[in-house]
Regions:
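Short loop/helix-cap segments at secondary-structure boundaries that form the rim of catalytic
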Residues: 69-72, 114-116, 294-299, 363-369
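Short acidic, glycine/proline-enriched helix-loop-strand junctions
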Residues: 329, 348-349, 363-382
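Metal-dependent phosphodiesterase/nuclease catalytic metal-binding core
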Residues: 18, 134-348
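Hydrophobic, well-ordered secondary-structure elements that form the walls
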Residues: 354
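Glycine-centered loop/turn motifs
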Residues: 110-114, 301, 375-381
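Short, polar loop motifs at secondary-structure junctions
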Residues: 61-63, 84, 110-111, 239-241, ...
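His/Asp/Glu-rich metal-coordinating catalytic cores
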Residues: 1-56, 62-219, 223-226
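Short acidic-hydrophobic, aromatic-tinged amphipathic segments that line or gate anion-handling sites
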Residues: 104-111, 258-268, 372-374
Length: 382
């Protein structure tokens, strides 16, 4: 087995990992960089005659899927069904990709093994800020490899990770593991349950509340929705409501958390009742509708809960301007694994070799078992 991390060995985002045998090869993710727009050159996948059996995507964030259009036309593209549904809605709204690319994507089924020649791939769901994210168990040449994708254990579905590893994965030869947050803090991340608890207090204390969070961060929206006091409006725009309805259709039967029964689509006809009863409204600063409603209630001293990475606010001048003059409370937790979660995965599956990706400090992993720290494009043979 040969492994090539084409990008992501010393940076967060923009990842692509190739796994090959003598006969076959697959690629996990093809992401654009968080800063900059550098294309990746992958012989046999983005240029030249195709020599790749499939590209599989862990989730819909652009730092994992942003370069999907660069993949050769004859190479199959795969992701989970709900990931594809959400991507289609995003693309209809934001025009991220040519629709011909979206039409090429085939959905896979969680826990159902896929075969690409002598490479077997089994996807398993993980908790992440992108709903329906997956990790991949890859079996080839008598070796077992686990590619975590982006994951965490402090979300609503995070408690399922270790039982899944124990029941379906077992010991592996190689762990390709994300390390987004290892350079930020050694503390345990705040859980989505804690976010919901803190939100409940803020919503009880403030009659008018706007929430700024990613429209596709379904767990975060669920955390706030569950905290809305009885008799208070819970609102979003039509795009956000369509996303939530799509999740409800696929995941609502599995958990009432994802049915969003309180959520209503905002309409100007509700303005007077919103003033009377109060509200919690999910907004997208810069969006015309959101901006209008926020300005309409600005003189009533509403609270804005900012629930995204602080770096976005620091770097985005238009976002700063949109929130200028409002009372702001930050309430957020990472969508990525903390050190405790990473350690628990390593302890459970006992890899012989660890290959860190999606990290600026891969050397942190050296405290664990044998760790290979390749550069982008370097070949690792097993």
């Amino acid at each position: 087995m040969k492994i090539i991390v084409h990008r992501g060995t010393h940076q967060i985002g923009g990842c692509a990992t190739e796994i090959r045998t003598n006969q076959n090869g697959i690629i996990i993710d093809a992401g654009s960089e968080l800063e900059g727009n550098t294309l990746m050159s992958i012989p046999g996948a983005t240029e030249g005659k195709s020599n790749c059996d499939a590209v599989l995507f862990t989730h819909y964030h652009v730092d994992h899927i942003g370069l999907i259009e660069s993949i050769n036309d004859d190479i199959p593209l795969l992701m989970s069904e709900l990931t594809l549904d959400i991507l289609k809605l995003q693309n209809n709204r934001q025009k991220l990709f040519n629709t011909k690319i979206i039409d090429r994507i085939t959905p896979f089924v969680t826990a159902r093994t896929l075969s690409f020649g002598d490479i077997k791939v089994t996807p398993f769901m993980v908790d992440h800020s992108a709903f329906d994210s997956h990790m991949f168990l890859i079996e080839a040449d008598g070796k077992k490899l686990l590619h975590t994708g982006d994951f965490r254990t402090h979300g609503f579905r995070g408690k399922g990770l270790l039982p899944t590893l124990k029941k379906y994965i077992g010991d592996v030869d190689v762990l390709i593991c994300e390390g987004t947050t290892v350079n930020r803090s050694t503390k345990k991340s705040k859980s989505e349950f804690e976010i919901s608890t803190e939100a409940r207090k803020l919503l009880a204390e403030n009659k008018y509340v706007f929430i700024v969070c990613a429209s596709t961060n379904i767990d975060r929206i669920a955390a706030f929705c569950s905290a809305v006091p009885r008799g208070r409006y819970c609102l979003c725009d039509l795009y956000q409501k369509t996303l939530l309805d799509t999740v409800n259709e696929k995941a609502g039967l599995l958990s009432s958390l994802y049915t969003f029964p309180k959520m209503l689509t905002y309409s100007p006809a509700l303005d007077e009742k919103m003033k009377q009863q109060g509200f919690c409204m999910f907004v997208r600063p810069g969006n015309y509708l959101s901006s209008r409603v926020m300005e309409q209630f600005k003189d009533k001293d509403p609270l804005v809960i900012y629930s995204m990475w602080q770096g976005y606010l620091e770097k985005n001048v238009s976002l700063q301007n949109a929130l200028s003059g409002f009372r702001i409370e930050e309430l957020h937790t990472s969508g990525h694994a903390d050190l405790e979660a990473i350690h628990s995965v390593i302890t459970e599956i006992k890899p012989k070799v660890i290959i860190p990706i999606h990290t600026e400090m891969p050397e942190v992993f050296k405290k664990y078992l044998e760790t290979k720290l390749p550069c982008d494009g370097e070949e690792i043979f097993l």
